[in-house]
Curated annotation (Swiss-Prot):
Coiled coil: none annotated. Pfam families: Ribosomal_L28. NCBIfam families: L28. The gene is rpmB. Belongs to the bacterial ribosomal protein bL28 family. GO terms for biological process: translation. One of its GO terms (molecular function) is structural constituent of ribosome. It comes from the Bacteria. This is Large ribosomal subunit protein bL28. The keyword Ribonucleoprotein applies. Keywords: Ribonucleoprotein, Ribosomal protein. Disulfide bonds: none annotated. GO terms for cellular component: ribonucleoprotein complex; ribosome.
Length: 78
């Protein structure tokens, strides 16, 4: 399974790890993905999603159906 958020499409970021002596090495910063089973009220069913914690906070604020609609995602396919 790929490490990509199913709603936002967030994936890993290429960054640098900088030591105390300022030696820089490449580092991969992974997205904070969580496997969640969320209730989709409009579809009257549970939906299993692998989403970032940022997307989870937005879902708690807006609701799953409204957030997916704003992103242009059809939850019926998931």
């Amino acid at each position: 399974m790929s490490r990509v958020c199913q709603l936002t499409g967030t994936k890993a970021n290429n960054g640098m790890a900088v030591s105390h002596s300022h030696i820089r090495t490449k580092k991969l910063q992974q997205a904070n993905l969580q496997q969640r089973r969320l209730w989709w009220a409009e579809g009257k069913r549970w939906v299993n999603l692998r989403i970032t914690t940022r997307a989870l906070k937005t879902i708690q604020k807006k609701g799953l159906g409204a957030y997916a609609k704003s992103l242009g995602i059809d939850l019926a396919r998931l």
